[in-house]
Amino acid sequence: MTRLQKGSIGTLLTGALLGIVLVAVVFGGEAALSTEEFCTSCHSMTYPQAELKQSTHYGALGVNPGCKDCHIPQGIENFHLAVATHAIDGARELYLELVNDYSTLEKFNERRLEMAHDARMNLKKWDSITCRTCHKKPAPPGESAQAEHKKMETEGATCIDCHQNLVHEEVPMTDLNASIAQGKLVLKPEDDGDDEEADEDEDEETEEADDSSDSESASSSDNSDNEDDNNDE
């Protein structure tokens, strides 16, 4: 074996060793960054953690999900999404943790809607893959719910388009399709149901007022007739 051949083999072995080390560092680092202990090492994340443990998603059927189960895509096929999430979103949130004051829940709530929307947009981008990890082919009861689920096939909707505010403190729902189209946070319009109920209540009050007015008029007329009869007598 010539010196050149020995050098080539040495280079290949060195490259392979470095590759193994790099893969171990990347996968090990990703696993470490996905732990709940790491997520909640930032003070601001202690608030969502407490909300998670009080939600219906925690403890049901003996399942205790952590931050990563909803916010980080799992599985080797989604590893690139997990790395990108930590690299981009993680860096941004670390910066915001340093420049913002999250010392109280009230201060945290000032950015809650923005943070919730960012998380929703991630789920939208991933086709709610972390939801589907647990909720496999959901078949909701009732025609109305089944019709809504059809939107996932016909309108490009995904779980997070409708199922918001399930775990953390409630904030206004956001229209994710409109947000993507306009490149900014867009709130969902409020339901017309409340307005219709208010209109119905107003109509009922008007009818009651009219009935009351008619009754008073009839009573006044009767009293007037009685007075006339008395005068005639």
Swiss-Prot record:
What's the PTM story here? Binds 4 heme groups per subunit.
Instruction: Give the UniProt subcellular location, in the record's own words.
Output: Periplasm
One GO CC annotation: periplasmic space
Q: Name one GO biological process term.
A: anaerobic respiration
Report residues binding heme 4: 159, 162-163
Which stretches does UniProt call biased (Acidic residues)?
Answer: 191-214, 224-233
Amino acids binding heme 3: 131, 134-135
Instruction: Keywords in alphabetical order, please.
Output: Electron transport, Heme, Iron, Metal-binding, Periplasm, Signal, Transport
Q: Which InterPro entries match?
A: Cytochrome_c-type_ET (IPR051174), Multihaem_cyt_sf (IPR036280), NapC/NirT_cyt_c_N (IPR005126), NapC/NirT_cytc_sf (IPR038266)
In its UniProt record, a GO molecular function of this protein is: metal ion binding
Binding of heme 1 occurs at 39, 42, 45, 93
Binding site residues for heme 2: 67, 70-71, 168
- Extent of the signal sequence: 1-28
Site features described as Interaction with NrfA, chain residue numbers: 165
* Disordered: annotated segments: 182-233
Please tell me where this protein is predominantly located. Answer: periplasm
Write one Pfam family the protein is assigned to.
Cytochrom_NNT
The UniProt family comment states: Belongs to the NapC/NirT/NrfH family.
Protein known as: Probable tetraheme cytochrome c-type
